[in-house]
Amino acid sequence: MTPNKPLFINMNKPEIIIRPARIEDAAAIARTVAEAIGDEVALNNYCGKDYLSVLTEISRAEGTQYSWQHAIVAECEGRVVGSVVGYDGAKLAELREGTFAVLRNRVGRVPDIADETEAGEHYLDSLSVAPQYQRLGIGSKLINAFCQRAFSEGAVHVGLIVDAENPNAERLYLSQGFTHVGERIFFDHKMHHLQRTKPR
């Protein structure tokens, strides 16, 4: 390299930082969870019409399914532009009770929903990237960061469920090393159960 020669900087490709979430990221995590649930009817049934506020409170709390403690975010120029949240499937009942405690307080009821995960897998619950930052590889980076953290904490399998009617999301997960292991019904939707196994 020629001394003092300036490096080429692609100003069209912003620098993306992948980092553990902080409590102040709770609102961004709430948007991720809302987008993952997707269906507004399901959101209202789950946590009421003021669902973003309720999900933000859940994300700010400790010991809930969507706690900031379980999330990893993508940051660009000081703004969170994507996040992934998940937890040890063996802790579903414990974390769901923490989540339901907020729902009882805010909404006055809790939903009757099936278990989305179980012991034996680290569950990737929700993933989203802001529309204007999609197709930059951020989703893949978040998935891999989540999997690496899970594997470093002793997980052998990372699991998730994806709507059978969302082939684009499914293709993303399959491209990142996930494979089909079964099907489940969740929020009245047929879901494909995928897992990625820790490399030997």
Give the positions of each predicted feature:
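Conserved beta-strand in the GNAT
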Residues: 73, 79-88, 123, 128
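Conserved GNAT acetyl-CoA-binding A-motif
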Residues: 121-122, 150-161
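Conserved beta-strand-loop-alpha-helix junction that forms the acyl-donor binding cleft
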Residues: 125-134, 160-169, 185-191, 196-197
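Conserved N-terminal entry element of GNAT/NAT acetyltransferase domains
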Residues: 1-24, 44, 198-200
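Conserved acyl-donor/pantetheine-binding loop and adjacent beta-alpha core of acyl/acetyltransferases
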Residues: 88-126
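Conserved GNAT-fold acetyl-CoA-binding loop/helix
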Residues: 37-60, 69, 96, 103-106
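A short helix-loop-beta-strand connector motif used in the catalytic cores of GNAT acetyltransferases and
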Residues: 60-73, 90-94, 123
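Conserved acetyl-CoA-binding loop-helix of GNAT-fold acetyltransferases
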Residues: 135-149, 171-175
